[in-house]
């Protein structure tokens, strides 16, 4: 029979990309929004929820994550990317087992649900464990097993990660009524050899898959790639056929005008990760240049080990204010554009055209914020309120496909105490 949200403020996006708020009603039947209006609908709903002083908006989409890395939160703080990754992170990851990934994924999901994230894109190891966690929790996710190769003598047939990735796709793609999608993933240029990248990229294209990569995260990465191959990482991936599939490229901090032209030509989606890039001292993506080129720009937290949380409201805040300060121009990026990055642009990147906005016929991926807070009054500009004033702690409800997964501090699908118990056991073993 469905759920009717009554007397709430609704964040609506017009066809022109502008945002407005409507005070009224929103109805959900099954997994779909079936009513939006100022008058109470005549149809019957099984459940009625009074939402005075609440704002309903699309769920946030975290397009670049390594969710089990919540177990490494704070490891190697203060180091630049390469030293952090090779000296601190990789040695711990070498000791991870599937049970660790299961525990870390569920802990990350608790954090994401409570902070208004309804879908995320993930690349990591033992991804079937993350698939199971997402299925249990009721979230949406694009999950991938990232491929690496440090040995130039390793043949394609000897690389065990490639068949693991393909098997994951064939087994789980579009599972749970499409809530779970499987992507292909290459970690980065500096962690994979060309012959592996070319062969794996061909497999992705043959399967009609989407690709998730790290790309031009630092100037050092670009300089070393040019020294090795005579071209930038962007041009390198283009030459090897990776960009021939729908691609999500995380970071793109150190990209030239020529790189941006390549990204545009291939329809590459770029994921802006402001907190991680700032924390690791990597720099800041040329947001305005990318958007002016017509590139779809989404938003991500990166893993909690380099952030150190999965809070998309914090990402929106930095994505809003940092370009303006860096360029000495308060019009460099608008709050509405940042809100798009965290919602509709993220949906586009994940291949989910049926979500990302509140509209009749769209999937009911909805979050509610409590506006009855000192820091949220008055409100003269809702996008700016959300990107520059709201906190993740203002989230009081998270719904995915019409099912409430989190409400007023209570998780509906996961046992919070069990998740913490299992996560503590993993941390104790890893860091004993």
Predicted segment positions?
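Active-site microenvironment of metallo-dependent hydrolases
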Residues: 1-24, 29, 39, 342-432
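Divalent metal-coordination and catalytic microenvironments
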Residues: 8, 26, 31, 53, ...
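Active-site gating loops and adjacent loop-to-helix segments of metal-dependent hydrolytic enzymes
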Residues: 71-103, 110, 140-162, 219-246, ...
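Alpha-helical scaffold segments that flank or form the walls of functional sites
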Residues: 73-139, 162-175, 423-432
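Metal-coordinating catalytic core of metallo-dependent amide/deamination hydrolases
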Residues: 129-253, 258
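His/Asp/Glu-enriched, well-ordered alpha-helical/loop segment
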Residues: 239-246, 288-373, 389-391
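A conserved active-site cap/scaffold subdomain adjacent to cofactor or substrate pockets
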Residues: 258, 264-295, 300-301
């Amino acid at each position: 029979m469905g759920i009717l949200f009554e007397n709430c403020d609704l964040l609506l996006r017009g066809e022109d990309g502008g945002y407005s708020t409507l005070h009224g009603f929103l109805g959900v039947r099954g997994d779909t929004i079936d009513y939006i209006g100022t008058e109470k609908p005549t149809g019957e709903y099984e459940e009625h929820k009074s939402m005075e002083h609440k704002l309903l908006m699309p769920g946030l989409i975290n397009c670049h994550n390594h969710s089990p890395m919540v177990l490494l939160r704070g490891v190697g703080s203060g180091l630049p990317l390469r030293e952090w990754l090779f000296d601190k992170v990789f040695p711990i990851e070498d000791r991870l087992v599937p049970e660790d990934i299961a525990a870390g994924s569920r802990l990350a999901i608790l954090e994401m649900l409570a902070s208004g994230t309804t879908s995320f894109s993930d690349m990591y190891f033992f991804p079937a464990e993350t698939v199971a966690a997402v299925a249990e929790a009721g979230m949406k996710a694009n999950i991938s097993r990232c491929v690496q190769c440090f040995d130039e003598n390793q043949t394609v047939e000897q690389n065990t990660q490639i068949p693991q990735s393909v098997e994951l796709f064939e087994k789980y793609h579009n599972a749970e009524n499409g809530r779970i999608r499987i992507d292909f993933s290459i970690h980065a240029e500096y962690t994979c050899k060309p012959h592996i990248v070319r062969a794996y990229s061909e497999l992705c294209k043959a399967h009609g898959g989407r690709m998730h990569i790290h790309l031009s995260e630092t100037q050092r990465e670009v300089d070393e790639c040019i020294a090795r191959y005579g071209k930038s990482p962007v041009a390198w991936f283009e030459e090897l056929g990776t960009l021939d599939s729908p691609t999500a490229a995380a970071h793109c901090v150190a990209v030239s005008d020529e790189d941006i032209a390549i990204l545009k030509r291939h329809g590459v989606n770029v994921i802006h990760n402001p907190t991680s890039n700032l924390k690791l001292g990597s720099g800041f993506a040329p947001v305005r240049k990318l958007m002016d080129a017509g590139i779809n720009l989404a938003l991500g937290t990166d893993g909690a080990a380099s952030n150190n949380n999965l809070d998309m409201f914090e990402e929106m805040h930095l994505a809003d204010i940092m370009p303006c300060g860096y360029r000495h121009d308060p019009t460099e990026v608008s709050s509405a554009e940042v809100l798009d990055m965290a919602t509709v642009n993220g949906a586009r990147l994940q291949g989910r055209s049926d979500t990302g906005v509140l509209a009749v016929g769209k999937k009911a991926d909805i979050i509610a914020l409590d506006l009855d807070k000192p820091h949220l009054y008055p409100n003269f500009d809702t996008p700016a309120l959300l990107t520059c004033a709201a906190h993740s702690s203002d989230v009081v409800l998270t719904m995915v496909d019409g099912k409430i997964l989190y409400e007023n501090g209570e998780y509906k699908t996961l046992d919070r105490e069990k998740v913490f118990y299992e996560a503590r056991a993993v941390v104790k073993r890893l860091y004993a």
